[in-house]
Design a protein with these regions (language model features):
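Two-component histidine phosphotransfer core
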Residues: 1-165, 172-175
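C-terminal end segment of the histidine kinase catalytic
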Residues: 167-188
Length: 188
């Protein structure tokens, strides 16, 4: 009986993983102009996190506390996924009671997304070098962070992109600064 229950649970997990993978692939192939909404991006993140929790045995908790009124803002597709991936692989993986919290606030004509994890912190100089594109840092790790930062700066200018919150002592936090722009399909 136990063996049958194990298999049934395995099938359920396989079904969940395939559904999450389908959600991710749908996001990839349905995106024609490279832009999406914060709401769609957070749905993609949830699917990605579901897969990673299956992979690592739910060793961390994920919380999305972005206010729904910000869900209609435009964001380049796959902006948050590499940051959350970094938080999982370099922050909370192997940490007891690891947490990743994604939040956002409006700030003047911009909005800022925060990705915080309570796991391992990082060296300020290494992160700054990585975000600037220092070759020796990109070769080791963080190519996703570098790519996201570069893409945001190219799209919106030097005042936008990733900002490392150096004041966090227990954990790691990256801010994503973006201009407020509601997607054309959501404008009323």
């Amino acid at each position: 009986i136990k063996e049958g229950q194990d298999r049934a649970g395995g099938n359920e997990n396989t079904e969940k993983a395939l559904e999450a993978l389908g959600d991710i692939l749908h996001a990839v192939y349905s995106n024609k102009n490279g832009m999406t909404t914060v709401g769609q991006e957070t749905a993609l993140l949830k699917a990605y996190v579901d897969i990673m929790q299956m992979r690592f045995g739910s060793s961390f908790q994920y919380y999305n506390v972005i206010p729904t009124e910000l869900f209609y803002y435009e964001i380049p597709a796959f902006t948050m996924q590499p940051i959350v991936e970094n938080a999982i692989l370099h922050g909370v993986k192997g940490v007891t009671a690891g947490q990743i919290i994604v939040s956002a606030i409006e700030y003047e004509n911009d909005f800022v997304i925060s990705v915080f994890n309570n796991g391992n912190s990082a060296d300020k100089k290494k992160i700054e070098d990585l975000l600037k594109g220092e070759k020796n840092q990109r070769a080791v790790t963080g190519i996703g962070l570098y790519n996201v930062n570069s893409r945001l700066k190219l799209l919106y200018g030097e005042s936008y992109g990733l900002i490392y919150n150096e004041k966090v002592r227990n954990g790691f936090e990256i801010w994503v600064r973006l201009p407020k722009k509601i997607t054309e399909s959501e404008e009323r």
